[in-house]
Amino acid sequence: MRKLALVPIQFYRYAISPLMANHCRFFPSCSCYAYEAIENHGIWRGGWLAVRRLGRCHPWNDGGYDPVPPAPSSRTSSIAE
């Protein structure tokens, strides 16, 4: 199911995005962020993170570096170490 949710993002990244100028104000780009968020957090949480990120990508936001937050399992394992 997760792989199926990633197909439209991949289509956008490789078929549509190269035809348009680079408009994303963030690094990584919003499509890369969405792909990584869904891959790491699953469809629901990753999708929510992607929607929030798209909501922040507008001309009045400065943008900048905005990585996907780590998945909960990686947070707890780094704390335990």
Curated annotation (Swiss-Prot):
One GO CC term, this protein: plasma membrane
Major subcellular site: membrane
Subcellular localization: Cell inner membrane
Lipid biosynthesis as UniProt keyword: no
Segments of this protein annotated with the region Disordered: 61-81
Superkingdom in the source lineage: Bacteria
Membrane-protein topology: Peripheral membrane protein
PANTHER family cross-referenced by the UniProt entry: MEMBRANE PROTEIN INSERTION EFFICIENCY FACTOR-RELATED
Function, in words: Could be involved in insertion of integral membrane proteins into the membrane.
Alphabetical list of NCBIfam families matching this protein: membrane protein insertion efficiency factor YidD
Family that this chain belongs to: Belongs to the UPF0161 family.
Protein name stated in the entry: Putative membrane protein insertion efficiency factor
